[in-house]
């Protein structure tokens, strides 16, 4: 059984110079540190899982959950000691995406900077590709 993590939003990125990488998803140092902090309180979990669900005004939304195991069709990204599993349904939507963690006075959230997005809703929680 998995538990929801925290809020996540998505940003369309234009004219981003893609860097060659073998991983479908890269993490910023801020995202790595936050995931490590969250997993410290959940020793029974091995990482976080990114999924995609149909919802919102633009069609798709990312989900983040704690996970205890790697699913058979999950892609695994290991970066700086953090394990992120990507559900099969989300793999193509995440190619070239950077996962960041942003905090300010009003909110804190994971942000997916995705160069493949064609549009987002006003709040940034749903997108289309």
Curated annotation (Swiss-Prot):
<dbReference type="InterPro" id="IPR017870">
    <property type="entry name" value="FeS_cluster_insertion_CS"/>
</dbReference>
<dbReference type="GO" id="GO:0051537">
    <property type="term" value="F:2 iron, 2 sulfur cluster binding"/>
</dbReference>
<keyword id="KW-0408">Iron</keyword>
<dbReference type="GO" id="GO:0016226">
    <property type="term" value="P:iron-sulfur cluster assembly"/>
</dbReference>
<dbReference type="GO" id="GO:0120510">
    <property type="term" value="C:mitochondrial [4Fe-4S] assembly complex"/>
</dbReference>
<dbReference type="GO" id="GO:0005737">
    <property type="term" value="C:cytoplasm"/>
</dbReference>
<comment type="similarity">
    <text>Belongs to the HesB/IscA family.</text>
</comment>
<keyword id="KW-0809">Transit peptide</keyword>
<feature type="binding site">
    <location>
        <position position="123"/>
    </location>
    <ligand>
        <name>Fe cation</name>
    </ligand>
</feature>
<keyword id="KW-0225">Disease variant</keyword>
<dbReference type="Pfam" id="PF01521">
    <property type="entry name" value="Fe-S_biosyn"/>
</dbReference>
<dbReference type="GO" id="GO:0046872">
    <property type="term" value="F:metal ion binding"/>
</dbReference>
<dbReference type="GO" id="GO:0005759">
    <property type="term" value="C:mitochondrial matrix"/>
</dbReference>
<comment type="function">
    <text>Involved in the maturation of mitochondrial 4Fe-4S proteins functioning late in the iron-sulfur cluster assembly pathway. Probably involved in the binding of an intermediate of Fe/S cluster assembly.</text>
</comment>
<dbReference type="InterPro" id="IPR000361">
    <property type="entry name" value="FeS_biogenesis"/>
</dbReference>
<feature type="transit peptide" description="Mitochondrion">
    <location>
        <begin position="1"/>
        <end position="12"/>
    </location>
</feature>
<feature type="binding site">
    <location>
        <position position="121"/>
    </location>
    <ligand>
        <name>Fe cation</name>
    </ligand>
</feature>
<protein>
    <recommendedName>
        <fullName>Iron-sulfur cluster assembly 1 homolog, mitochondrial</fullName>
    </recommendedName>
</protein>
<comment type="subunit">
    <text>Interacts with CRY2, but not with CRY1 (in vitro).</text>
</comment>
<keyword id="KW-0496">Mitochondrion</keyword>
<dbReference type="InterPro" id="IPR016092">
    <property type="entry name" value="FeS_cluster_insertion"/>
</dbReference>
<dbReference type="GO" id="GO:0005739">
    <property type="term" value="C:mitochondrion"/>
</dbReference>
<keyword id="KW-0411">Iron-sulfur</keyword>
<dbReference type="InterPro" id="IPR035903">
    <property type="entry name" value="HesB-like_dom_sf"/>
</dbReference>
<dbReference type="InterPro" id="IPR050322">
    <property type="entry name" value="Fe-S_cluster_asmbl/transfer"/>
</dbReference>
<feature type="binding site">
    <location>
        <position position="57"/>
    </location>
    <ligand>
        <name>Fe cation</name>
    </ligand>
</feature>
<keyword id="KW-0479">Metal-binding</keyword>
């Amino acid at each position: 059984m998995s538990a929801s993590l925290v809020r996540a939003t998505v940003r369309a990125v234009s004219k981003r110079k893609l860097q060659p990488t073998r991983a479908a998803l890269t993490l910023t140092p801020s995202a790595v540190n936050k995931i490590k902090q969250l997993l410290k309180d959940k020793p029974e979990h091995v990482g976080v899982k990114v999924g995609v669900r149909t919802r919102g005004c633009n069609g798709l939304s990312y989900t983040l959950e704690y996970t205890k195991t790697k699913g058979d069709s999950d892609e695994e990204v290991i970066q700086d000691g953090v394990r992120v599993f990507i559900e099969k349904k989300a793999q193509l939507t995440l190619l070239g995406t950077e996962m960041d963690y942003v905090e300010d006075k009003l909110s804190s959230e994971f942000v997916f900077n995705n160069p493949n997005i064609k549009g987002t809703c006003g709040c940034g929680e749903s997108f289309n590709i």
